[in-house]
Regions:
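Mid-domain alpha/beta scaffold segments of enzyme catalytic cores
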Residues: 1-284
């Protein structure tokens, strides 16, 4: 497959404001690679345009193994590893969790995830998903790492698992999609709330109400690339620079200057994950 690399920054900057330092708290380098994007060249181009820190989220140990050299291509690349609910039906899930634990022991990962519960799709029986989620929460706790949580129509069960885990560093509710009245409960569990490109959709009224309930110091923004492209690019391949459209929408909804939002969200990511990693090659 031919590897594409262009970000089409001329189109992005022609349609919305671009401010260096914008972060992306959640993207999938290996899913982009599977779509024909060379993640190394993509990261180098993002760096040239002044993109801020990024969180590369692996959803299986196999994905994790493919990301080990990526920090050499981008200053400020955080790495996370976990077992996504989409992989909860695999027969070797216990072995996968053991491998995730060994990866975390290397000390080169900034978070555990993506993990969580998905009651919308029957990837595996609920009991299996819950066992895998709880095991990963325990790993996050034992390694003193934040957790990146996927929650699809499983609010109460996610909250109960987080309360039981009592994570020392909380984590991120990725691509938040819960009702507005759930925001406070997740904040109480030490979670940051991250919004993706779907908040730019004009129909996202409830999601926009939830946004307004998030304190400034607990807000994160993401792409979930290559998925969930923001308006007006809905349905097209997503990548981290497209987060600019989400920033513009969020700044408008919150009545905030865009530059102030960029600074605040970057500070929030650093407060949760620590100082951005150096531009050095890492194992994994």
């Amino acid at each position: 497959m031919t590897k594409k690399t262009s970000l089409d920054m001329a189109r992005i900057t022609g349609e919305t404001a671009w401010i260096p330092g914008m972060i992306d708290s959640h993207f999938h380098s290996q899913a982009l690679a599977d779509q024909g994007i060379d993640p190394r060249k993509l990261l180098e181009e993002l760096a040239r345009h002044g993109m801020g820190p990024l969180v590369d989220v692996a959803i299986t140990p196999e994905d994790t193994a493919r990301t080990g050299d990526l920090p050499a291509h981008y200053p400020g690349l955080y790495r996370s590893c976990g077992l996504h609910p989409v992989a909860s039906g695999r027969q070797d899930w216990r072995d996968a969790l053991d491998l995730i634990g060994r990866n975390l022991s290397e000390g080169t990962f900034s978070a555990l995830g993506e993990t969580g519960l998905d009651w919308y799709r029957a990837y595996a029986p609920r009991e299996r998903q819950q066992e895998i989620f709880q095991a990963q929460l325990s790993l996050a706790s034992s390694h003193n790492l934040p957790v990146i949580v996927h929650n699809r129509e499983a609010d109460q069960d996610c909250l109960e698992a987080l309360r039981k885990a009592d994570l020392p560093r909380g984590g991120i509710m990725h691509c938040f999609s819960s009702p507005p009245d759930r925001v406070a409960a997740f904040l109480d569990e030490g979670m940051y709330i991250s919004f993706a490109g779907n908040i730019t959709f004009p129909s996202a009224r409830e999601l926009r109400e939830a946004l307004l309930r998030v304190p400034a110091d607990r807000l994160l923004l993401e792409t979930d690339a290559p998925f969930l492209s923001p308006h007006p690019h809905r349905g097209r391949l997503n990548h981290p620079a497209m987060v600019a459209f989400t920033y513009a929408t969020v700044a408008d909804l919150r009545g905030q200057h865009l530059q102030d939002l960029v600074r605040q969200v970057a500070a929030n990511l650093e407060a949760l994950l620590g100082e951005a990693p150096l531009n050095t090659s890492r194992g994994g």
